[in-house]
């Protein structure tokens, strides 16, 4: 038997996509079982490790999810890595591990600076950690960066100035 692939083949991607599409968020155990079985067929595959973690996370079993996210992250890249970092940071927040969550989001935002979702979830972690001013500043900058309406553009300097002020409180 040869080495087990840690790649995401088109076939494996289709299998993962189908299982994800068919999951029942109210009853995640069949999805957990499916991905755990798939992992036995592809041991150490980071993409499957991520999906197992995500399934446990959705089921409310955050401590278990973290184990899988941590195993998956070194082997992931691109959008899957971004999603794993987001879910990992969010899960740490849900477990009141705010400093760790914020470290994950700081690194993730540096690696994926164009990710709006990372910035939103970073703001949630800042808020949960009691840093409401910095959370609001993060969201204000997101609005200024991404909401290009005439009204926002007119007040962009004021929005950015307020964001800077809040971030430094």
Positions of predicted regions on the chain:
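Start-of-helix register in tetratricopeptide repeats
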Residues: 13, 47, 80-83, 117, ...
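Residue-level signature for tetratricopeptide repeat
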Residues: 18-21, 55, 91, 125
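TPR-repeat structural position
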Residues: 25-28, 62, 98, 132
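Alpha-helical adaptor scaffolds
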Residues: 47-111
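TPR/TPR-like (Sel1-like) alpha-helical repeat modules
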Residues: 74, 127-150
